[in-house]
């Protein structure tokens, strides 16, 4: 069974605080866990994060979405899959729901397409080949 928990919400609503509290609790009951964030969590994903968060960049909505998805793919393949295989809890600061909220509803991209792309990532997480 995957132990993958995502925390979603607007900026500064307490996601990081709740993740840290849950991680400390899991540590106290001897449950292995890791904390990851989107975008980020790997060297490549952190570089993508810098591009996305740079206010000087005027990124169109499609490029922005593809960068977020690229960061997610890297995180899944470098970190999340390995943690699933080790039966660790994965505590993730944002994931696919943020894509729907920000790129779908916020930027007006096609929700059906975003849902299909998000499904691909859940498949990727559970496919160990």
Which ranges hold each PLM region?
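Hydrophobic anchor at the beta1->P-loop junction of P-loop NTPases
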Residues: 4-7
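Walker A (P-loop) phosphate-binding loop of P-loop NTPases
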Residues: 12
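Conserved lysine of the Walker
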Residues: 15
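Hydrophobic positions on the alpha1 helix immediately C-terminal to the Walker A/P-loop
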Residues: 18, 22
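Rossmann-fold NAD(P)-dependent oxidoreductase module
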Residues: 25
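Short glycine-/polar-rich loops that comprise or flank the Walker A/P-loop
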Residues: 29-31, 124-129
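ATP-dependent small-molecule kinase phosphotransfer cores
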Residues: 31-122
